[in-house]
């Protein structure tokens, strides 16, 4: 948490701890000793070539914006960004950082959970859904909600189980053939009852096959995998009507 010359920056220190290492215009970094390295800049470096350089006229939703790294980068490309998070600490960091980067007029910050988006009429050209899915108690509900909000693209990222094998399940698995679910590449998701990385909100770890299957089941198609655990998706098809009714009941949403 220091400027290039090594002097600490009081405004950064008073907002610590930081999970995003932001590179501010004056040379300041917010978390230069981050255990993951220059995070999330190294993720952005891999993803950025897959996102249009010109985002003027695009509306973007950043779900779980944290300190605002991605919101700031997308605003720099011309997007109007709505950035939501449930943690006021992160939102304070993000608002401050957006001002330092002179993009605060392009970003609207709100404190709210992902599920509350179901009650809003707005939709977005790009939905940014990174680092949130596995923290949710009801992850597929969130995917179903965000499918309704996505017009063009969604960037999805989740903590995952190791392995990239994909087994395509049969269209109808007989009940006495469930041993196939133990095969490598079967879509599965581990439930984390206790802690992972000392975080009590790390609930889930899907494997790669499960991520792709859940995205398909929610009405997305994977266009690219720009980085480890990252999936660039586009809306595709529709989800079955019974699940639409279930979503409405889960979030107390009135029929259209």
Task: Mark where each language-model region is.
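Glycine-rich SAM-binding Motif I of class I
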Residues: 68-72
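Conserved alpha-helix/loop element of class I SAM-dependent methyltransferases that forms part
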Residues: 37-56
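N-terminal, positively charged/glycine-rich alpha-helical extensions of SAM-dependent methyltransferases
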Residues: 1-30
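Conserved class I S-adenosyl-L-methionine
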Residues: 58-66
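Class I SAM-dependent methyltransferase Rossmann-like catalytic core
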Residues: 28-39
